[in-house]
């Protein structure tokens, strides 16, 4: 069966446009790079291989050969991978453009066949090449595509020669077939017309073609934060915020949509060549503040959390405790977003003040029934189980009933940050000494959402943005977040 790699290798000699479009990494020298231990189709050479992460989108979709070309389907340079990429929604006109792309880049006619016969080394006898010499001429046109689902309305489809579905559940895409959205008979006629130029004995490949063109579609996979690699994440030790490096091939030429790009492919090939010749490999540094990272960090925080702090007598913040084996968490918070650190300090301080105001406890080495609930409370932040967990924590503080309402005391001294936060949340001039469940819950929710408005957070990293969006955000100054650096009085915070 013909492979996409073979077709790119031989067809790159036909035209000046092909020399640039068909230059894929799989036909060059292999450079050693780490892989993600994920088996799947490389989207650039359409081969089954161990995938490694792409520097443009941080998703594993290229092999160790093709990754050295540094191409991503989200680039705006019109290379072959970009030309095979179509954004949702799929229309019949877009599918026709994909078919025209194959006919332009990989034509099959008498002139092309004769040229390839002259180009292939014959040595002693053509019989030695009875199978090999024409392999690249048997490339069928299929409408199979690798589908990336970022959300319900943000989907990308990368068309190529995929001979079967993806078996690895960790691959970020799924193979779908759009033959029903086009026209089965019309696509068959296009392929029969292409193959009619080949010798009769080669037309038996039609049976294999039908198997590929009728490949059933797989159920789309929703991409989550865990699918993105950590290799492109950069932690800014100065601002204490995570960021992500995004590399894209950027050209000054712009197209309104895919249809205009394919129109230039047919009518103005020199424009595409000029765009590829003048493109620049550009680095974008973007913030990594998204809901996926927030949930991952909250999960890690709950795992490393030291709930013994709520029974301790430490005067400092929970994140500053360093020499207490029951409360030390500084090793984890040293390289974490300062907003998470501030939230952890306020939350633990508030629960500590409430708990010690109502329950007779010793110090941080004592064993309390509330400890497991503290971890559960952190894990339940920004989830639907938050209200239930807050109520359980409240009930473990020995509330008393006053006029039919359960209340707890708040009589310990508060630090200035927590004092201002409670005043702002309850909208009062002085802190009450008695809290009911609604007030307690409001304070906990206010502390957790002090720095994060979940409704406005993106679900996935900025690396899923198109190159045009990244350029626009960079020019407007919204690509990175700007915060005032929190300066602590503790010398340990500056380490």
Swiss-Prot record:
RNA-binding, as annotated region: 1-81
Subcellular location: Host cytoplasm, Host cytoskeleton
Pfam family of the protein (one): Rota_NS53
GO molecular function ontology, one term from the record: metal ion binding
Region entry Zinc-binding domain, spans: 42-79
Keywords: Host cytoplasm, Host cytoskeleton, Host-virus interaction, Inhibition of host innate immune response by virus, Inhibition of host IRF3 by virus, Inhibition of host IRF7 by virus, Inhibition of host RLR pathway by virus, Interferon antiviral system evasion, Metal-binding, RNA-binding, Viral immunoevasion
Main localisation: host cell
One GO cellular component term noted in the UniProt record for this chain: host cell cytoplasm
Motif pLxIS motif, residue range(s) on this chain: 485-488
Top-rank taxon: Viruses
UniProt note: domains: The integrity of the zinc-binding domain in NSP1 is important for degradation of host IRF3. The pLxIS motif targets host IRF3 for degradation; however phosphorylation of NSP1 pLxIS motif is not required for its activity.
Function: Plays a role in the inhibition of host innate immunity by inducing the degradation of key host factors required to activate interferon production such as IRF3, IRF5 or IRF7. Associates with components of cullin RING ligases (CRLs) including CUL1 or CUL3, which are essential multisubunit ubiquitination complexes, to modulate their activities.
Quaternary state and interactors: Interacts (via C-terminus) with host IRF3; this interaction leads to IRF3 degradation. Interacts with host IRF7; this interaction leads to IRF7 degradation. Interacts with host CUL1 and CUL3.
Protein name as catalogued: Non-structural protein 1
């Amino acid at each position: 069966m013909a492979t996409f790699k073979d077709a790119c290798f031989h067809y790159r000699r036909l035209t000046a446009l092909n020399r640039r479009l068909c230059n894929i990494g799989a036909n060059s020298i292999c450079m050693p790079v780490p892989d993600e231990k994920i088996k799947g189709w490389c989207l650039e050479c359409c081969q089954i291989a161990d995938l490694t992460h792409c520097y443009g989108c941080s998703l594993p979709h290229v092999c160790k050969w093709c990754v050295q070309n540094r191409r991503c389907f989200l680039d705006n340079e019109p290379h072959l991978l970009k030309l095979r990429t179509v954004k949702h929604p799929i229309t019949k006109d877009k599918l026709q453009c994909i078919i025209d792309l194959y006919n332009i880049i990989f034509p099959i006619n008498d002139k092309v066949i004769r040229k390839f016969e002259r180009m292939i080394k014959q040595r002693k006898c053509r019989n030695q090449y009875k199978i090999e010499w024409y392999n690249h001429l048997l490339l069928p046109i299929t409408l199979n595509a690798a589908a990336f689902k970022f959300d319900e309305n943000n989907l990308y489809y990368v068309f190529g020669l995929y001979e079967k579905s993806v078996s690895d559940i960790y691959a970020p895409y799924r193979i779908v077939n759009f033959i029903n959205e086009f026209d089965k008979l019309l696509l068959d006629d296009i392929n029969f017309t292409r193959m009619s130029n080949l010798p009769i004995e080669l037309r038996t490949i039609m049976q294999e073609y039908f198997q590929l063109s009728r490949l059933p579609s797989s159920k789309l996979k929703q991409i989550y934060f865990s699918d993105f690699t950590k290799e492109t994440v950069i932690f800014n030790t100065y601002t204490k915020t995570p960021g992500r490096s995004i590399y894209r091939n950027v050209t000054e030429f712009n197209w309104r949509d895919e249809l205009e790009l394919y129109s230039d492919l047919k009518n103005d090939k020199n424009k595409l060549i000029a765009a590829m010749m003048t493109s620049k490999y550009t680095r974008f540094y973007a913030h990594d503040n998204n809901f996926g990272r927030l949930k991952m960090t909250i999960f890690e925080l709950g795992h490393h959390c030291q709930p013994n702090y709520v029974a301790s007598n430490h005067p400092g913040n929970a994140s500053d405790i360093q020499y207490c084996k029951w409360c030390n968490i500084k090793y984890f918070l040293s390289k974490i977003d300062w907003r998470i650190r501030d939230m952890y300090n306020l939350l633990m301080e508030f629960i500590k003040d409430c708990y010690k105001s109502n329950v007779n406890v010793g110090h941080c080495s004592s064993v309390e029934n509330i400890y497991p609930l503290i971890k559960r409370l952190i894990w339940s932040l920004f989830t639907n189980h938050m209200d239930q967990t807050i109520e359980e924590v409240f009930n473990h503080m020995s509330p008393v009933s006053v006029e039919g309402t359960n209340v707890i005391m708040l009589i310990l001294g508060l630090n200035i940050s927590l004092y201002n936060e409670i005043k702002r949340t309850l909208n009062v001039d002085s802190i009450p000494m008695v809290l009911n469940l609604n007030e307690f819950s409001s304070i906990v929710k206010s502390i957790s959402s002090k720095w994060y408005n979940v409704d406005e957070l993106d679900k996935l990293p900025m690396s899923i943005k198109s190159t045009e969006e990244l350029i626009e955000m960079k020019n407007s100054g919204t690509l990175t977040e700007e915060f005032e650096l929190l300066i602590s009085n503790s010398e340990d915070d500056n380490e």
